[in-house]
Amino acid sequence: QVVDAAMIDGVAAMGALVAQMRAIRYWSDDPAHNFFLHSSPFYESFVCADGRFVTLGAIEPAFYAELLRRLELDDVDPARQYRSEDWPALKARVAERIRSRTRDEWCAALEGSDACFAPVLSFDEAAAHPHNAARDLFVEIEGQRQPAPAPRLSATPARSPSAGVRIGEHTDAVLAELGLDEDAVVRLRAGKACA
Protein backbone atom coordinates (compact mmCIF):
# COMPACT_ATOMS: atom_id res chain seq x y z
CA GLN A 1 0.00 0.00 0.00
CA VAL A 2 1.22 3.49 -0.85
CA VAL A 3 0.53 6.19 1.73
CA ASP A 4 0.05 9.52 -0.04
CA ALA A 5 0.30 12.07 2.79
CA ALA A 6 1.12 15.49 1.39
CA MET A 7 1.44 18.33 3.89
CA ILE A 8 -1.21 20.32 2.03
CA ASP A 9 -3.70 17.47 2.57
CA GLY A 10 -3.18 17.78 6.31
CA VAL A 11 -3.65 21.53 6.12
CA ALA A 12 -6.96 21.09 4.31
CA ALA A 13 -8.06 18.41 6.79
CA MET A 14 -7.33 20.78 9.68
CA GLY A 15 -9.69 23.19 7.95
CA ALA A 16 -12.65 20.84 8.41
CA LEU A 17 -13.93 22.86 11.36
CA VAL A 18 -13.68 26.06 9.31
CA ALA A 19 -15.53 24.36 6.45
CA GLN A 20 -18.32 23.33 8.83
CA MET A 21 -18.52 26.78 10.44
CA ARG A 22 -18.58 28.30 6.96
CA ALA A 23 -21.39 25.96 5.89
CA ILE A 24 -23.57 27.18 8.77
CA ARG A 25 -22.49 30.82 8.28
CA TYR A 26 -20.42 31.14 11.46
CA TRP A 27 -17.27 31.94 9.48
CA SER A 28 -16.44 35.09 7.54
CA ASP A 29 -14.02 34.98 4.62
CA ASP A 30 -12.88 38.46 5.65
CA PRO A 31 -9.45 37.93 7.28
CA ALA A 32 -10.03 41.00 9.44
CA HIS A 33 -12.57 38.93 11.37
CA ASN A 34 -10.37 35.80 11.56
CA PHE A 35 -6.97 36.80 12.80
CA PHE A 36 -4.21 35.80 15.19
CA LEU A 37 -1.98 38.35 16.85
CA HIS A 38 1.72 38.11 16.01
CA SER A 39 4.40 40.55 17.01
CA SER A 40 7.19 39.79 14.54
CA PRO A 41 7.47 41.33 11.07
CA PHE A 42 8.34 37.97 9.45
CA TYR A 43 5.44 35.78 10.66
CA GLU A 44 2.26 37.69 10.08
CA SER A 45 -0.50 38.55 7.63
CA PHE A 46 -0.49 41.98 6.01
CA VAL A 47 -3.09 43.94 4.05
CA CYS A 48 -2.28 44.81 0.44
CA ALA A 49 -3.25 47.84 -1.64
CA ASP A 50 -6.46 46.12 -2.76
CA GLY A 51 -7.61 45.22 0.77
CA ARG A 52 -6.69 41.56 0.32
CA PHE A 53 -4.01 39.88 2.41
CA VAL A 54 -0.69 38.08 2.12
CA THR A 55 0.99 36.09 4.84
CA LEU A 56 4.67 35.78 5.63
CA GLY A 57 6.32 32.90 7.44
CA ALA A 58 10.06 33.49 7.02
CA ILE A 59 11.15 32.01 10.33
CA GLU A 60 14.50 30.59 9.20
CA PRO A 61 17.36 33.07 8.59
CA ALA A 62 17.91 32.17 4.92
CA PHE A 63 14.23 32.65 4.13
CA TYR A 64 14.13 35.88 6.13
CA ALA A 65 17.11 37.27 4.19
CA GLU A 66 15.35 36.40 0.92
CA LEU A 67 12.16 38.06 2.14
CA LEU A 68 14.02 41.27 2.99
CA ARG A 69 15.67 41.24 -0.43
CA ARG A 70 12.35 40.72 -2.21
CA LEU A 71 10.72 43.49 -0.16
CA GLU A 72 13.65 45.76 -1.10
CA LEU A 73 14.48 46.39 2.56
CA ASP A 74 18.21 46.32 1.88
CA ASP A 75 19.08 48.46 4.91
CA VAL A 76 17.70 45.85 7.34
CA ASP A 77 20.35 43.52 8.78
CA PRO A 78 19.05 39.93 8.52
CA ALA A 79 21.33 38.95 11.40
CA ARG A 80 19.07 40.97 13.72
CA GLN A 81 16.01 38.89 12.82
CA TYR A 82 15.32 37.72 16.37
CA ARG A 83 15.96 41.08 18.08
CA SER A 84 12.42 41.71 19.25
CA GLU A 85 13.24 45.33 20.08
CA ASP A 86 13.50 45.90 16.30
CA TRP A 87 10.16 44.29 15.52
CA PRO A 88 7.63 47.11 16.03
CA ALA A 89 9.39 49.59 13.73
CA LEU A 90 10.26 46.94 11.15
CA LYS A 91 6.76 45.50 11.21
CA ALA A 92 5.41 48.97 10.40
CA ARG A 93 7.83 49.22 7.47
CA VAL A 94 6.89 45.76 6.17
CA ALA A 95 3.21 46.66 6.47
CA GLU A 96 3.79 49.88 4.54
CA ARG A 97 5.73 48.02 1.85
CA ILE A 98 3.05 45.32 1.47
CA ARG A 99 0.35 48.02 1.23
CA SER A 100 2.16 49.43 -1.81
CA ARG A 101 0.99 46.61 -4.13
CA THR A 102 -2.07 44.44 -4.67
CA ARG A 103 -2.17 40.83 -3.55
CA ASP A 104 -1.84 39.65 -7.15
CA GLU A 105 1.18 41.89 -7.68
CA TRP A 106 2.82 40.36 -4.59
CA CYS A 107 2.00 36.89 -5.91
CA ALA A 108 3.75 37.73 -9.18
CA ALA A 109 6.77 39.10 -7.31
CA LEU A 110 7.14 36.43 -4.61
CA GLU A 111 5.61 33.12 -5.71
CA GLY A 112 8.26 30.55 -6.48
CA SER A 113 10.85 32.30 -4.30
CA ASP A 114 12.19 31.21 -0.91
CA ALA A 115 10.62 34.23 0.79
CA CYS A 116 8.06 32.03 2.62
CA PHE A 117 5.10 33.96 1.32
CA ALA A 118 1.54 33.02 0.41
CA PRO A 119 -1.61 34.86 -0.57
CA VAL A 120 -4.38 34.59 2.00
CA LEU A 121 -7.08 32.82 0.02
CA SER A 122 -10.78 32.67 0.66
CA PHE A 123 -12.22 29.19 1.04
CA ASP A 124 -13.42 29.26 -2.58
CA GLU A 125 -10.06 30.55 -3.83
CA ALA A 126 -8.27 27.77 -1.94
CA ALA A 127 -10.48 25.15 -3.56
CA ALA A 128 -9.86 26.64 -7.02
CA HIS A 129 -6.08 27.07 -6.57
CA PRO A 130 -4.33 25.02 -9.31
CA HIS A 131 -2.19 23.04 -6.84
CA ASN A 132 -5.17 22.14 -4.66
CA ALA A 133 -7.40 21.35 -7.65
CA ALA A 134 -4.71 19.06 -9.13
CA ARG A 135 -4.63 17.12 -5.85
CA ASP A 136 -8.44 16.97 -5.59
CA LEU A 137 -8.02 18.55 -2.19
CA PHE A 138 -11.72 19.36 -1.83
CA VAL A 139 -14.88 17.37 -2.56
CA GLU A 140 -18.49 18.42 -3.01
CA ILE A 141 -20.92 16.65 -0.65
CA GLU A 142 -24.60 17.52 -1.02
CA GLY A 143 -23.71 20.98 -2.30
CA GLN A 144 -21.16 21.64 0.45
CA ARG A 145 -17.46 21.86 -0.32
CA GLN A 146 -15.40 19.89 2.20
CA PRO A 147 -11.71 18.96 2.51
CA ALA A 148 -10.98 15.53 1.03
CA PRO A 149 -9.88 12.86 3.52
CA ALA A 150 -6.17 12.67 4.33
CA PRO A 151 -3.83 10.88 4.24
CA ARG A 152 -4.53 9.10 0.97
CA LEU A 153 -4.07 5.35 1.14
CA SER A 154 -3.78 3.48 -2.15
CA ALA A 155 -5.15 0.14 -0.89
CA THR A 156 -7.72 1.43 1.60
CA PRO A 157 -9.13 4.76 0.46
CA ALA A 158 -11.00 6.76 3.07
CA ARG A 159 -14.73 7.33 2.97
CA SER A 160 -15.93 10.69 1.72
CA PRO A 161 -16.81 13.13 4.49
CA SER A 162 -20.46 13.69 5.28
CA ALA A 163 -22.25 16.96 4.72
CA GLY A 164 -22.44 19.41 7.59
CA VAL A 165 -25.61 19.44 9.64
CA ARG A 166 -27.85 22.33 10.60
CA ILE A 167 -27.77 23.48 14.22
CA GLY A 168 -30.43 21.51 16.08
CA GLU A 169 -30.90 18.96 13.31
CA HIS A 170 -30.33 16.00 15.65
CA THR A 171 -31.56 17.55 18.91
CA ASP A 172 -34.71 15.42 19.18
CA ALA A 173 -32.85 12.15 18.53
CA VAL A 174 -30.04 12.96 20.98
CA LEU A 175 -32.40 14.05 23.76
CA ALA A 176 -34.62 11.00 23.20
CA GLU A 177 -31.54 8.78 23.44
CA LEU A 178 -30.77 10.49 26.75
CA GLY A 179 -34.24 9.54 27.98
CA LEU A 180 -36.03 12.90 27.77
CA ASP A 181 -39.67 12.81 26.75
CA GLU A 182 -41.35 15.21 24.30
CA ASP A 183 -42.60 17.54 27.08
CA ALA A 184 -39.07 17.90 28.48
CA VAL A 185 -37.73 18.74 25.00
CA VAL A 186 -40.46 21.38 24.54
CA ARG A 187 -39.50 22.95 27.89
CA LEU A 188 -35.79 22.96 26.98
CA ARG A 189 -36.53 24.65 23.67
CA ALA A 190 -38.86 27.19 25.31
CA GLY A 191 -36.09 28.04 27.76
CA LYS A 192 -33.61 28.35 24.86
CA ALA A 193 -31.48 25.59 26.39
CA CYS A 194 -31.23 23.79 23.06
CA ALA A 195 -31.92 24.30 19.38
Predicted stretch roles:
Residues Q1-V54, A58:
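Active-site-adjacent "lid/gating" segments in soluble enzymes
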Residues L37, P41-S113, F117:
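Aromatic-enriched alpha-helical interface/lid elements that frame and gate functional surfaces
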Residues R69, E111, A128, A176, ...:
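Short polybasic/polar patches that bind polyanions
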Residues L73, N132, L180-D181, A193:
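Helix N-cap/coil-helix junction residues
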Residues P78, I141-R189:
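Flexible, small-/acidic-enriched active-site or ligand-binding loops
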Residues P78-K91, L121-A128, Q144, A184-A195:
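Short linear loop/turn motifs
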Residues E111-P161:
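A glycine-rich dinucleotide-binding beta-alpha-beta segment and adjacent secondary-structure elements
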